[in-house]
Amino acid sequence: PVDYPIFFSELSMVPDDIVPLKKSFYESPTSEGMDKRWSEWLIKWKLLSDSSTNVNTTAPHSCKELSKQMRLVNPKYSLREWFVMPAYQQATERNYSLVRELQDIITQPYAEQSKDVKEKYYRLKPSELFDIGGLSQYSCSS
């Protein structure tokens, strides 16, 4: 499994290899075969990206331009239920500090933000939360 917000955030840096992308993998690719497949995919993606052109010109995208465009549409931080639930719980006791903290972060989801924010909120979901309804994923009642 892959954490797609982290995956696309890392991919938006247009990495030279798959090492940064591995931050988004829930299970580390243990086999050389898996690393090889991801590496081949990244090469193909970069070739396709190199062959695409800027909408406003016929010139190909530069890596820098592609990275900039991807970072505009792929937030680094997203509101996740497993971050929100503790904030709800604290708020029921009139402690809104975590709600405010999340609000500050999510109002700038594309920004790099501080090292502390990155360590706390730019990470994979803990494995113990995988099968807990309401924490593992958002629910939809529609």
Model-based region annotation:
Residues 1-142:
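Regulatory N- and C-terminal appendages and interdomain linkers associated
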